[in-house]
Amino acid sequence: MESLSKYKLVFLGDQSVGKTSIITRFMYDTFDITYQATIGIDFLSKTMYLEDRTVRLQLWDTAGQERFRSLIPSYIRDSSVAIVVYDITNKVSFTNTIKWIEDVRNERGNNVVIMLVGNKTDLADKRQVSIEEGEAKAKEYDIMFTETSAKAGFNIKALFRKVASALPGIDSNSMTKNQHEIISEVDITDGGKPALKEGDGFCSSSRC
């Protein structure tokens, strides 16, 4: 039996940008309105089913507070993916993505997939960072980019599918057209629900 490929994904970004909420939405399809800061590092894993293989995603949720920054390089060091999150309603959190990206580059060079994520699109009326600014930052650093809403569930599964398609050893041709393009195709309706329902393909069992 072929062994299950495992990939480490580390979530980085300032405090309260929604790193934990993105992971919780992906893992359990829930959103906790009560904010609790991550203390140190949390770890969860989930199995993801692609068309031609199954992978185990190991999700490392890091604290955004400055007092925990000394811990983070050691977790970046052996990661396959770095997901750098900012809050679209907080310009400072966007500006600070530069230092998070540089931390990743310093530890991993170019041997890592980096995804820049603008979270909290459900608060579009309070937006301080435009989509164009996010796209420009991603282009500048030659990394991937998307926007999400952990609260509304917008683009969460699409985010992980996009990351999965870029993992080392994954043939991007095995991802369907919809899996490749769903990030730009889905949208938020007036009711705050995704206009396009994303497909499943994830193990929801606690044993995954």
From Swiss-Prot:
GO MF terms, alphabetically ordered: GTP binding; GTPase activity
Gene Ontology BP annotations: intra-Golgi vesicle-mediated transport; intracellular protein transport; retrograde transport, endosome to Golgi; retrograde vesicle-mediated transport, Golgi to endoplasmic reticulum
Record-level GO cellular component terms: cytosol; endomembrane system; Golgi apparatus; lipid droplet; pathogen-containing vacuole
Lipidation (S-geranylgeranyl cysteine): C208
Pfam family, one: Ras
Domain of life: Eukaryota
Keywords carried by this UniProt record: GTP-binding, Lipoprotein, Nucleotide-binding, Prenylation, Protein transport, Transport
Binding positions (GTP): 14-21, 38, 62-66, 120-123
UniProt key word Protein transport: yes
InterPro entries assigned to the protein according to its UniProt record, in alphabetical order: P-loop_NTPase (IPR027417), Rab (IPR050227), Small_GTP-bd (IPR005225), Small_GTPase (IPR001806)
Physiological role: Protein transport. Probably involved in vesicular traffic.
Membership in a protein family: Belongs to the small GTPase superfamily. Rab family.
Family annotation (NCBIfam families): small_GTP (TIGR00231)
Protein name as annotated: Ras-related protein Rab-6
Organism of this sequence: Dictyostelium discoideum (Social amoeba)
